[in-house]
């Protein structure tokens, strides 16, 4: 990572001339992405630390102010667990997904659609943005079907369809939709939906320019190095060699599935650093890993 990105990422004050250089570097990207749609999946430490929450809200507001349509999909697993504990309910997981019975789905709905969603909307508004809270239940935003392991997971759903007309309407009005990942089926049953899966489905349905995962992972590591870009062929080789392993494998495979669905690029960035979202989008080098269909040898770091 170049020294300037390191300074800005750390939260330290960078020299004015260096900040000016970043602004100049950002200009072609601002022009390029005006009118485009970015879907951002917001989760991890960036949702817990007050400084990081404010930084993220500032970043999202700026993206919208320069003409980018921002659609935000958030998680909230820790908040759900805390609320459940206060209500005397224990949280159980199966292969990383929350087992969701009738009692737990009420906790999920109350927590995600209530406190978590509205806190994000409030923060964005405090920084000058115009956000609107949305759940998958509103205007059929997310129609769901039972997941394949419903016998073990209960009311956990997969996305069946997305109401793109409603989301587009909000974006055209200059609003930032903040979407809680719950949905319902044709019988009216409500489902808890994995936020990563919901963000991927929304990005594909909207034919988004980018899907950006704000997480607790810096990107894809090869040894001590963070890959700036990775294409499908490289990923297959790294998985075969064991360089990409464990829980990172499904994330990588999901990213390329989303690319195959028509999304322009997928980005994986670390939300534990201030302004990582802007640095990833508006600098040549970026701060995370972008997933692309194939490598462009003429523009290897092009965001």
From Swiss-Prot:
Domain of life: Bacteria
A Gene Ontology term for the protein's cellular component: cytoplasm
Pfam family, one: AA_kinase
Protein's UniProt keywords contain Amino-acid biosynthesis: yes
InterPro entries: AceGlu_kinase-like_sf (IPR036393), AcgluKinase_fam (IPR004662), ArgB (IPR037528), Asp/Glu/Uridylate_kinase (IPR001048), Glu/AcGlu_kinase (IPR001057), NAGK-C (IPR041727)
Alphabetized GO MF terms: acetylglutamate kinase activity; ATP binding
UniProt site positions, description: Transition state stabilizer: 41, 251
Primary location recorded for the protein, binned into one broad class: cytoplasm
UniProt-listed Gene3D superfamilies: Acetylglutamate kinase-like
Cell compartment(s), UniProt: Cytoplasm
Chain sites annotated for binding substrate: 76-77, 98, 192
Pathway connected to this protein: Amino-acid biosynthesis; L-arginine biosynthesis; N(2)-acetyl-L-ornithine from L-glutamate: step 2/4
Keywords: Amino-acid biosynthesis, Arginine biosynthesis, ATP-binding, Cytoplasm, Kinase, Nucleotide-binding, Transferase
Any one GO biological process: arginine biosynthetic process via ornithine
Disulfide-bond pairs as recorded: none
Reported function: Catalyzes the ATP-dependent phosphorylation of N-acetyl-L-glutamate.
Family: Belongs to the acetylglutamate kinase family. ArgB subfamily.
Protein name: Acetylglutamate kinase
Species this protein is from: Chlorobium phaeobacteroides (strain DSM 266 / SMG 266 / 2430)
